[in-house]
A protein has these predicted regions:
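A short, flexible loop at the N-terminus of ABC-type nucleotide-binding domains that lies
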Residues: 3, 12-25, 56-62, 78-90, ...
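Conserved ABC transporter NBD signature motif
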Residues: 63-77
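A short, proline-enriched helix->beta-strand linker immediately N-terminal to the Walker B motif
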Residues: 176-180
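Charged, flexible cofactor/metal-binding loops and thiol motifs
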Residues: 244-332
């Protein structure tokens, strides 16, 4: 059964220059206990898709089309009478059944509030428990995520922790209410390589211990290979390919997916390896392409790619791609 179903989601932002079409007709599903990786360059729409889901869009952003069904309930903004009613509902589930691990703990954590205050806040907001009980749970969460001496450190401030330990606090806050869905938005971006590996090991072990479903937003295909069951490749505000991790890594279909893979070094390859960066820049979403969003950077682009958005081609029940190269209707 799908825990999350996003259908034809579009999100825009009003700016002085015009409307930015940040998310365009995105459809995704997530099963209970599954880990889905969303991969793409900066500005591809990964984070804004998740902010649309969680009701965390900036004031100039709005969902213009589509539906979002979470845990059997339609939580699309249009399903509510007004924004006030929608925001009130989202506050009830955000931090409770649906949580987010943000990429920059220094920004997310309040530097003038003790860790205890920030750890027990979701528990006090969403659970009918006393402050003493909430503190006990907070201490156990700190132990669970590998923070030493929790009885001492719970009384400290975030700035007294290292970057890796601050990220562990973020993870503990996300886990506080045993959420059904955890969204991890580039959770290792601000960390050095050694600490990145430790945090990923932690997320992997917590995944095995809980029933939570996870959406991992990243540009790092190594993270995807390690943690994810399925992968969605995003470019120019659109999902261009989805598949299992094996299908994406061993049988990629979209030229953008192939381009991403060609940028990754293979540590098992003894020969000198030449990496091939993708030429060009992502499309301007103030004026997105009429056809395929990747057309201006694609070495295999055809005339139809410029004028018509590719239809979805299905290679298996789990593997779909939007590319004219693989479509039976394409005029070569």
């Amino acid at each position: 059964m799908a825990l999350l179903e996003i259908k034809n989601l579009s999100t825009e932002f009003k700016t002085e220059q015009g409307s930015v079409q940040a998310v365009r007709d995105v459809s995704l599903s997530l099963k209970e206990g599954e880990v889905l990786g969303i991969v793409g360059e900066s500005g591809s729409g990964k984070s804004q898709t998740m902010f649309s889901l969680m009701g965390l869009l900036a004031d100039n952003g709005r969902v213009t089309e589509g539906t979002i069904t979470f845990d059997g309930q339609d939580i699309s903004p249009k399903n509510f009478k007004n924004k006030r009613e929608y925001d009130k509902f989202m506050r009830k589930i955000r931090g409770n059944t649906m949580t987010m691990i943000f990429q920059d703990p220094m920004t997310f954590l309040n530097q003038v509030l003790k860790v205890e205050t920030q750890l027990i806040e979701p528990l006090m907001n969403h659970k009918d428990i006393s402050k003493t009980e909430a503190r006990k749970i907070a201490l156990e969460l700190m132990r669970k995520v590998g923070i030493p001496s929790p009885e001492k450190r719970i009384n400290q401030y975030p700035f007294e922790f290292s970057g890796g330990m601050r990220q562990r606090i973020i993870i503990a806050i996300a886990l506080a209410c045993n959420p059904k869905l955890i969204i991890a938005d580039e959770p290792t971006t601000a960390l050095d390589v050694t600490i990145q590996a430790q945090v990923l090991e932690l997320i992997d072990s917590l995944r095995e211990e809980s029933d939570s479903s996870i959406i991992m937003i990243t540009h790092d295909l190594g993270v995807v290979a390690k943690l994810c069951d399925r992968v969605a490749i995003m470019y120019g505000g659109k999902i261009v390919e989805t598949g299992t991790d094996d299908e994406i890594f061993y049988s990629p279909k979209h030229p953008y997916t192939l381009g991403l893979l060609s940028c990754v070094a293979n540590p098992e390859d003894d020969d000198e390896e030449v990496l091939h960066p993708i030429p060009g820049s992502p499309p301007d979403l103030l004026d997105p392409p009429k056809g395929c969003p990747f057309v201006d950077r694609c070495e295999k682009a055809m005339r139809i790619c410029k004028d018509h958005m590719p239809e979805l081609t299905e290679f298996s029940p789990t593997h779909q791609c939007r590319c004219w190269l693989n479509h039976e209707k394409a005029v070569k």
